[in-house]
């Protein structure tokens, strides 16, 4: 039996499920089955991106699960994708979305996000590089990119548009010129990076915040032995024992109770189901505060590249790098 899910309502009137299936780092060959299983057990929100390289498989899963005689209508499933950095030029934006729609086998997206605030060099190279391994950038202003994204809503190709990995200053910048307002800001969010200030800013402007890596991205390839591990926090372990559930469910319930949308990634059926089963219990006010007190503004997701043989943050030197601001 499918699990029922709670929603946040976007300013557009769309209902966005509080738990979605993340597909970042889900390998081709695994992601199709994961999406099909998720839709079968009650997920109604799938988070995708062109750069993940698996939208064709996600599209196959949606096609086999959604439509006439398949038990699920298209309007019941909330699908998000993201514009990659090499397609920020206003002339490239619609083509980029049409490519994603073609891969996903859809007529429209429920939400289309600008993945990062800065642009890479125009063209078909996803990560255009200089000879030393550093990224080749382009000077396209994200406000011009946004204006092109607004036309996608006018054309019915996206029901809503939004931002990802933007800081408050950059979000305010977009809001100052937007005719079509951003509906969502997607950022890394978990108890070590609670994003309380950003959540408050979003709410004051009518945006919903989506948190990625809600479990601390335990499968990231660049983890270091000294990195803190969310799932091993004694307080989280104790709560999981008390409620007889997993540590992951405690972390997801904390977000759901804060009305933060989260998109945990998994390709394991048992975990996919478990991650959705967070709507039949509540954490006490004290437990919510204990989890919130873990905040240390610790960021797991900082893209790295190899330059001259050394691993360095990919975009930290860029003037639009979002993580130099406090939030």
Curated annotation (Swiss-Prot):
Its EC number is 1.1.1.2, 1.6.-.-. GO terms for molecular function: aldose reductase (NADPH) activity; S-nitrosoglutathione reductase (NADPH) activity. It comes from the Eukaryota. Keywords: Cell membrane, Cytoplasm, Lipid metabolism, Membrane, NADP, Oxidoreductase. NADP(+) binds at residues 13-24, 47, 164-165, 213, 215, 217, 265-268, 271, 274-275. One of its GO terms (biological process) is cellular detoxification of aldehyde. The record marks 82 as: Lowers pKa of active site Tyr. The active site is at 52 (proton donor). InterPro entries: AKR (IPR020471), AKR1A (IPR044481), Aldo/ket_reductase_CS (IPR018170), NADP_OxRdtase_dom (IPR023210), NADP_OxRdtase_dom_sf (IPR036812). GO terms for cellular component: apical plasma membrane; cytosol. It is found in: Cytoplasm, Cytosol; Apical cell membrane. It catalyses: a primary alcohol + NADP(+) = an aldehyde + NADPH + H(+); S-nitroso-CoA + NADPH + H(+) = sulfinamide-CoA + NADP(+); S-nitrosoglutathione + NADPH + H(+) = S-(hydroxysulfenamide)glutathione + NADP(+). Pfam families: Aldo_ket_red (PF00248). PANTHER family: ALDO/KETO REDUCTASE (PTHR11732). Belongs to the aldo/keto reductase family. Catalyzes the NADPH-dependent reduction of a wide variety of carbonyl-containing compounds to their corresponding alcohols. Displays enzymatic activity towards endogenous metabolites such as aromatic and aliphatic aldehydes, ketones, monosaccharides and bile acids. Acts as an aldehyde-detoxification enzyme. Also acts as an inhibitor of protein S-nitrosylation by mediating degradation of S-nitroso-coenzyme A (S-nitroso-CoA), a cofactor required to S-nitrosylate proteins. Also acts as a S-nitroso-glutathione reductase by catalyzing the NADPH-dependent reduction of S-nitrosoglutathione. This is Aldo-keto reductase family 1 member A1. It comes from Xenopus laevis. The gene is akr1a1.
């Amino acid at each position: 039996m499918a699990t029922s899910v709670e929603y946040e309502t976007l300013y557009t009137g769309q209902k966005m499920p509080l738990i979605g299936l993340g597909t970042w780092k889900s390998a081709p060959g695994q992601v199709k089955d994961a999406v099909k299983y998720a839709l079968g057990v009650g997920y109604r929100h799938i988070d995708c991106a062109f750069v993940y390289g698996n939208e064709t498989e996600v599209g196959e899963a949606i096609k086999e699960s959604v439509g006439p005689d398949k038990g699920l209508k298209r309007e019941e499933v909330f699908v998000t994708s993201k514009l990659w950095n090499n397609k920020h030029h206003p002339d490239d934006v619609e083509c980029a979305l049409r490519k994603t729609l073609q891969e996903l086998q859809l007529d429209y997206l429920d939400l289309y996000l600008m993945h990062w605030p800065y642009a890479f060099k125009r063209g078909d190279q996803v990560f255009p590089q200089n000879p030393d391994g550093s990224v080749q950038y382009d000077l396209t202003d994200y406000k011009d990119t946004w204006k092109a994204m607004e036309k996608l809503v006018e054309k019915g190709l996206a029901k809503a548009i939004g931002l990802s990995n933007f800081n408050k200053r950059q979000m305010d910048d977009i809001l100052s010129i937007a005719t079509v307002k951003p509906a969502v800001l997607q950022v890394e969010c978990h108890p070590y990076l609670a994003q309380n200030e950003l959540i408050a800013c979003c709410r004051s402007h009518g945006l919903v915040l989506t948190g990625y890596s809600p479990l601390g991205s335990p499968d990231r390839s660049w983890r270091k032995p000294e990195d803190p591990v969310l799932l091993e926090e004694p307080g989280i372990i104790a709560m999981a024992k008390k409620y007889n559930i997993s540590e992951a469910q405690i972390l997801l319930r904390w977000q759901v109770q804060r009305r933060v949308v989260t998109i945990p990634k998994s390709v394991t059926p048992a975990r996919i189901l478990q991650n959705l089963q967070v709507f039949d219990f509540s954490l006490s006010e004290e437990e919510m505060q204990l989890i919130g007190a873990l905040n240390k503004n610790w960021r797991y997701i900082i893209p790295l590249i190899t330059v001259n043989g050394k691993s360095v943050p990919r975009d930290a030197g860029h003037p639009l790098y979002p993580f130099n601001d406090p939030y």
